[in-house]
Curated annotation (Swiss-Prot):
One family name in Pfam for this protein: VirB8
Primary localization class, coarse: membrane
Protein name: Probable conjugal transfer protein TrbF
Membrane topology: Single-pass membrane protein
Gene Ontology CC: one annotated term: plasma membrane
Family statement: Belongs to the TrbF family.
Bilayer-crossing regions: 35-55
Length: 220
């Protein structure tokens, strides 16, 4: 004899089937929403990173050499300048001392000298504070009212790949051109090379040389 079993309720069975189907739809929709949100987040991150890279463009100088007729004869990228290339460093340091110490009655030219001095200085380096202090106590514009100073760089010697000794002579004249004094100075400059990162820096400081520290004294 077959065991007694309660007859199935068709309404309950239909309700259970509906619940199972609807629940699977809900779970599938939730999964797709999660995938969509993750995809949108990745797209936003990728777009933001692309925008960041677009603002970080690094300019590299490209040299084109021409002959007397203006015809291109050689092209290419300049070689990376290392500390061993003392000729370039010497020339740059000679210009630095000349710009820093020269005094002229032409205010526009004097400002150019000062600007050229600060092109090789960074705000975080000790040399900047020392030269700031010098200019605060020795205004070249005030000095130019009574005298001018011309600079002759006598010698630049590499003490290491980062430190150089600079000897120079200063010729002071009154506003009539009469020489009123000659003094010799010696400076010790510590330099560093940093690759230029933008067009403005390339124009002003193409090799990326900065004077990290600078001390100078008068010689007897």
């Amino acid at each position: 004899m077959a065991a007694n079993r309660a007859p199935e309720n068709p309404y309950l069975a239909a309700r259970q089937e509906w619940t199972e189907r609807y629940g699977s739809y809900v779970r599938a929709a939730a999964a797709w929403r999660t995938v969509g949100i993750l995809g949108l987040a990745m797209a936003v991150i990728g777009f933001g990173y692309a925008m960041y890279l677009s603002t970080e463009v690094k300019l590299v100088p490209y040299i084109v050499q021409v002959d007397k007729l203006g015809t291109s004869v050689t092209t290419g990228f300049p070689e990376q300048i290392e500390y061993a290339d003392v000729r370039v460093v010497r020339a740059t340091l000679g210009n630095f001392v000349t710009s820093f110490r020269s005094i002229t009655p032409d205010a526009a030219v004097q400002k150019q000298y000062i600007d050229r001095t600060y092109v090789l200085l960074r705000t975080s380096d000790p040399s900047t504070e020392k030269i700031n202090a010098w200019f605060r106590g020795n205004s070249p514009f005030e000095k130019a009212k009574t005298a001018t100073v011309a600079i002759e760089v006598n010698n630049i010697v590499a003490l290491s790949n980062q430190t150089y000794q600079i000897d120079w002579t200063e010729y002071e004249r009154d506003r009539k051109g009469k020489e009123i004094g000659t003094r010799r100075f010696r400076g010790i400059a510590t330099v560093t090379l940093t690759a230029p990162q933008d067009e403005a820096t390339i124009r002003l400081n193409p090799i990326g040389l900065y004077v990290r520290d600078f001390d100078w004294t008068a010689q007897l």
